[in-house]
C-alpha cells in the first residue's frame, strides 16, 4: 500500500454527562469524528483490516472518553486466555489505546479492555521498544456491551492520572484491536510488522479543539496499619509476641507533568510475586520492578547502560541476598520539565538488618531529547553506609555517567553509546 500518511483525529469538548455503560446512548457520540480506517499489523502489515472498527473520542474537565465499536465477521466465541487484570494483550481479543501526551515519541500510557470487560493499563517507555509496563496501576473506568455482530467498549480515563504539558494542541495516539478469531491484529496508525504495536513513533495525531488546560493538582495518600502475633508451643508454651506497623505512601502532582512520590515504612505485601524460574546459568536473573513507588518514570533511572550492565537497579534496594531489608522512607521527584527535558531525583534510606548496616541511596538523572527521536542522559548515584556515629566515610559507592540513545524517526537505525565511572573508597584513598 506504499507509505501511509499520519492519520489525524479531531476531539471536541462536551458538556454532556456521559454514563460509562457501553451503550453509547449519548448524542455526543453521534457527533464525534470517527477513526475507522484500520490497517493489519498481524499476520502481515500490507493490507487493510478485514473487520471494521469505529473509534470516537471526546472529553470534559475531568475525563478523556474513548468509545470503540468492534464489528465481528466471525460468530465463534471470543478468544480470551485470562480474566486477570493486566492480561497479556497479544493472546487475547481486545481493544487498546496508546497515548503520547508529550508528542516526544518516548513516553506514554496504554489502556486496554477485552470483550469480558477486563482492564489492562501500563506505561510506555523508551518509545515502546519493550512494549507496555503493566506494573503501573491507576483507577479508570470502562464497560463493555456485546451484541450479535459487534462488541462496544467505552472508557473514561481521568486527566489527573495522565502526565502532560498544558497548552498543547495535539497529542499522539494510536488504537489497536486484536481479532484473534480470524488471527488478525489491527491498528489505526499503521505499525510495521517488525515493531511492537505500542511503538510511539508510529502514532497518529489527536487534535484538540482548543489547547488543553492545566488540571488541578492531584494528591493521593495511601496509609496502612498492620499487626501480627506469633506464639511458640515447643519446647514450652510461651506467651504470644505481638508486632505492629504503620506507614504509607503519598503521590503529589507538582505540575501536570512532574510528580513527587513519598513513602514511610512502605508495605509491599500487596505487590505481585515474581514468577518462579529455575536458573541453571551462572548469571543472575533480572526480574522487573513491581513496587509502585519505583514504577512511574522508572526508565529515567534504570535505562542507563544495557541489560547486563545497569548502574542503577532498583530491585537491589530493600534486598540483600534475598533477605528483606526494611525501608525507613524515601522521596522521589520525576517527570517532564518541558517537551525536551526530563528530570529524576530519588533518595531512599534503609534500616539496619542483621550484619547489613543502614544505607542511604541517592540518584539524580537528567535527560534531554535531541535529533527529534534520540536522547542524551546524565546520571549520578551515591550509596553510603551509616554506623552508630553517623555516615561511614569509608563505605560508599558512587557512579557518574552519560548515555546517548540514537533512534531515527522511522526506527530503521538505532544505537547506544555510554560511559560510566565508579568510585570506591579503596580506589581513591590507596
Name these PLM-found stretches:
Residues 2-369, 374-378:
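Structural preference for beta-rich elements and adjacent junctions enriched in aromatics
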Residues 63, 340-341, 397, 404, ...:
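A general secondary-structure boundary signal
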Residues 244, 327, 349-351, 360-362, ...:
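Transmembrane beta-barrel architecture of outer-membrane proteins
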Residues 247, 251, 397-408:
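Extended, compositionally biased low-complexity polar/Lys-Gly-rich tracts
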Residues 254-256, 368-374, 385, 405-415, ...:
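Secondary-structure transition/capping motifs at alpha-helix termini
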Residues 326-328, 334, 395-397, 408-430:
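Exposed, low-structure sequence patches enriched in small/polar residues
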Residues 388-390:
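Solvent-exposed loop segments that connect transmembrane elements
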Amino acid at each position: 500500500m506504499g507509505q501511509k500518511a499520519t492519520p489525524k483525529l479531531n476531539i471536541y469538548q462536551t458538556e454532556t454527562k456521559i454514563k460509562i455503560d457501553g451503550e453509547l446512548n449519548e448524542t455526543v457520540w453521534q457527533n464525534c469524528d470517527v477513526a475507522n480506517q484500520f490497517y493489519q499489523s498481524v499476520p502481515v502489515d500490507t493490507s487493510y483490516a478485514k473487520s471494521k472498527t469505529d473509534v470516537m473520542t471526546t472529553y470534559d474537565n475531568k475525563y478523556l472518553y474513548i468509545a470503540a465499536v468492534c464489528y465481528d465477521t466471525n460468530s465463534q466465541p471470543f478468544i480470551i486466555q485470562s480474566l486477570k487484570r493486566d492480561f497479556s494483550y497479544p493472546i487475547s481479543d481486545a481493544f487498546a489505546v496508546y497515548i503520547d501526551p508529550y508528542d516526544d515519541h518516548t513516553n506514554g500510557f496504554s489502556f486496554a479492555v477485552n470483550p469480558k470487560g477486563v482492564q489492562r493499563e501500563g506505561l510506555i517507555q523508551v518509545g515502546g521498544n519493550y512494549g507496555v509496563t503493566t506494573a503501573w496501576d491507576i483507577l479508570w473506568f470502562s464497560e463493555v456491551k456485546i451484541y450479535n455482530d459487534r462488541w462496544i467498549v467505552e472508557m473514561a480515563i481521568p486527566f489527573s492520572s495522565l502526565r502532560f504539558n498544558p497548552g498543547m494542541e495535539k497529542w499522539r495516539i494510536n488504537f489497536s484491536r486484536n481479532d484473534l478469531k480470524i488471527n488478525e491484529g489491527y491498528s489505526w496508525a499503521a505499525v510495521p510488522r517488525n515493531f511492537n504495536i505500542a511503538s510511539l513513533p508510529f502514532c497518529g495525531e489527536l487534535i484538540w479543539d482548543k489547547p488543553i488546560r492545566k488540571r488541578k493538582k492531584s494528591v493521593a495518600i495511601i496509609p496502612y496499619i498492620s499487626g501480627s502475633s506469633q506464639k511458640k508451643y515447643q519446647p514450652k508454651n510461651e506467651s504470644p509476641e505481638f508486632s505492629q506497623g504503620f506507614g504509607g505512601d503519598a503521590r503529589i502532582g507538582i505540575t501536570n507533568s512532574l510528580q513527587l512520590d513519598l513513602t514511610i515504612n512502605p508495605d509491599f505485601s500487596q505487590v505481585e510475586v515474581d514468577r518462579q524460574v529455575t536458573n541453571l546459568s551462572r548469571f543472575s536473573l533480572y526480574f522487573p520492578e513491581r513496587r509502585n513507588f519505583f514504577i512511574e518514570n522508572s526508565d529515567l533511572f534504570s535505562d542507563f547502560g544495557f541489560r547486563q550492565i545497569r548502574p542503577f537497579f532498583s530491585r537491589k534496594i530493600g534486598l540483600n541476598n534475598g533477605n528483606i531489608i526494611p525501608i525507613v522512607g524515601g522521596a522521589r521527584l520525576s517527570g517532564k520539565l518541558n517537551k525536551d527535558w526530563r528530570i529524576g531525583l530519588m533518595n531512599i534510606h534503609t534500616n539496619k538488618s542483621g550484619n547489613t548496616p543502614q544505607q542511604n541511596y541517592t540518584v539524580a538523572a537528567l535527560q534531554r531529547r535531541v535529533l527529534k527521536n534520540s536522547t542524551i542522559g546524565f546520571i549520578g548515584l551515591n550509596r553510603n553506609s551509616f554506623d552508630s556515629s553517623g555516615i561511614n566515610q569509608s563505605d560508599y559507592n558512587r557512579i557518574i555517567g552519560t548515555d546517548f540513545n540514537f533512534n531515527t524517526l522511522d526506527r530503521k537505525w538505532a544505537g547506544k553509546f555510554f560511559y560510566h565511572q565508579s568510585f570506591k573508597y579503596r580506589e581513591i584513598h590507596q
